[in-house]
Amino acid sequence: MKIKNYFIIVFIIIVLSTDVISSQSSIEDKMYTSLNSYPCTRIMTLNGQIGCSSSHGGDSGILYLIDSDESYHNYFSYNQQKDIIVVFDSNYFNKTLVLEMYSKKKMNGALVLTDIGKTYPYSPEDQYPIKQFGLYPDSNLNWNPNGDGFTYMNFPFPMFALELKTSIIIRNLSTINRDGKYPAYGAELDSFMQGAINAETCLRRGFCEPVGGQSIWSSFSEVIDQSKPIILVMLPIDATAFFRDLATGTDQSGYALTVLLSMLNTLQGVDKTKWDKEVIFAMWNSERWGYVGSTNFVNDLLNFNCTSLDSNNQNSCSSPPMLDLTFEQIKFENIYAIIEFNQIGRPVNSGKKTPNKLDIYNLVFHPNGGAGANQLMDVFSQSTQSYENSTIQFQKTTQNELPPCSSMSFIKEINKKSAPNFIGTLVITDHDYQYNNPYFGDEQDNSGNINTTTSTLFDMVQVFSKSIDLLAGGNGTVKVDDLFIREINVCLTQSITCNWVTKLMSTFPYNPIPNFYSGVYGVSPVNHITPIETRFIFRMATYLTQHRTNATNCTSDNDCDTSSSICVNKVCLYSNTHYHNAISLAFSFDNSKSSWTIVNTSYPVFVESNWDYTTVRLFQVGSYANEIWFLVSGLIELLLSVGIIFYIKKYLSKRYKLL
């Protein structure tokens, strides 16, 4: 009888437990509404940490909107007894205001609205971005005058940006709170970052990965002819933003990337049999974190030594690990010229007009390398002058220093030599000295932050392509494809869900907003984490520089027989296009511990914390009187439930001897 009673009790407990779990999930779904959001994450440095993190389990509070000077000043006398989640209109989200608010009154977290953009120039980057890793670490120039260094601050509370539609809703609900109406609204912000202390500690504990990615280089030549000089046409591919999922970086990188890929499309149609120079197009990753991609490439050109080839792939090295050795075709001493496009999306109106009454815009030459650089400037100037209605013209900078640029990685290596062989270097920008980009490193460096005059974009592609063809030995006869330029511009500056992505990619992006934050390198030297934007650019470059095809009925790239080939519509496309590791030389992989370690602190040290998930959830809060009523009601319900249970127990025990 006792055993029977035991099973009955167990059965009742299981039924009640299942019901409680189901009810708990149902109640939670009714209490909370998840919001589309973009977190501020945490990055560890050599000496500490930057970015944001919530407490374990998240932080919550009542929403308080800051959208005017009055609401900002009222915040400090706000009598709300509960914790506060500050909702920032974008105009009030900057380093000065956030630090003042946090230092004077408890702030449990922050939500930033994106429905209305800033009405003033602002950059969360430094005034001289990554100066310590460049060519002039002691420079007094401030290239980025709107910068306040907000990105490099550390905050012990969570911050999220909200997507457009969500921002409109939260703005309205926060206004209800401020007006003192009920029900009030609160939010729970959960972005707990596992990393802590500094980069060394975080790596040792296994809670971080190095910031990095994959650079891309490409050539029309099937094999690099080592007897020919090399023209290196390049740009930084990555961008930054305080909320890294919103790092569109249209003027930082996206516009120039549009130009470079359009140049590949243009130059694929020219007669390259007359070229007496090799032309290599390179797109460096993780440049915004200390010129990581370009520095790594230069170091590998000069110092990489494979001691053991991969037995299954003679173009891959097993020790030290290197998946693709094709870069060994490139000799550093063969580099004849470097041409870099760096922030070219906001050229200044010169005040002049073309014969057909179009505005003419100025691009700026930043030369280095004496006579070689002068030759490059001459060719580009002659190319634009050869077009009667060209809407771009060039002027030479008034500065003696190069702006922050990837070319510095090559020049630093040249300067180490006792008898340097100067490489003619030309950096082309939209600014002479201080950036024309008012939102460098900010979420508002988007498609609305660039020159939208299509004729200027077309003319850049035409003039740049003609110049490269002439420098390589061609006759300068080029024809641009206006439709391709328009389409690829949309892909890289507005929506990564364009037709070219559909054609070339087997996967589709979760977020349509182009995001050029480099991300993390990966868990080991051969296990990379490559974002869809980087993969798309690689496939686009491969498609545009293909030198042969093979109809194999392939279903994936694995069905094609080289790492520089891709499968498109059941056809393998072969190209001399390759990934190259973009990871700081500060790191080395310890195989015995299966973890990254810091081996050279003279190079950039940035590692990103791991996290399980991030979320923002909205909930309602009743008035004080309502909360008291719910508490009393709950206690009454509890007492009644306990009484009923005791009565049933007594009844069953007496009547059926069950308990």
Swiss-Prot record:
Residues 649-659 are cytoplasmic. Residues 1-22 form the signal peptide. Residues 23-627 are extracellular. It is a single-pass type I membrane protein. Gene3D superfamilies: Zn peptidases. Glycans are attached at residues 94, 172, 305, 389, 451, 475, 550, 553, 600. GO terms for cellular component: endoplasmic reticulum; gamma-secretase complex; plasma membrane. The chain crosses the membrane at residues 628-648. InterPro entries: Ncstrn_small, Nicastrin. It holds the Pfam family Nicastrin. GO terms for biological process: autophagy; macropinocytosis; membrane protein ectodomain proteolysis; Notch signaling pathway; phagocytosis; protein processing; sorocarp spore cell differentiation. It is found in: Membrane. Keywords: Glycoprotein, Membrane, Notch signaling pathway, Signal, Transmembrane, Transmembrane helix. Essential subunit of the gamma-secretase complex, an endoprotease complex that catalyzes the intramembrane cleavage of integral membrane proteins such as Notch receptors and APP (amyloid-beta precursor protein). It probably represents a stabilizing cofactor required for the assembly of the gamma-secretase complex. Belongs to the nicastrin family. Homodimer. Component of the gamma-secretase complex, a complex composed of a presenilin homodimer, nicastrin, aph1 and pen2. This is Nicastrin. It comes from Dictyostelium discoideum (Social amoeba). The lineage of its organism: Eukaryota, Amoebozoa, Evosea, Eumycetozoa, Dictyostelia.
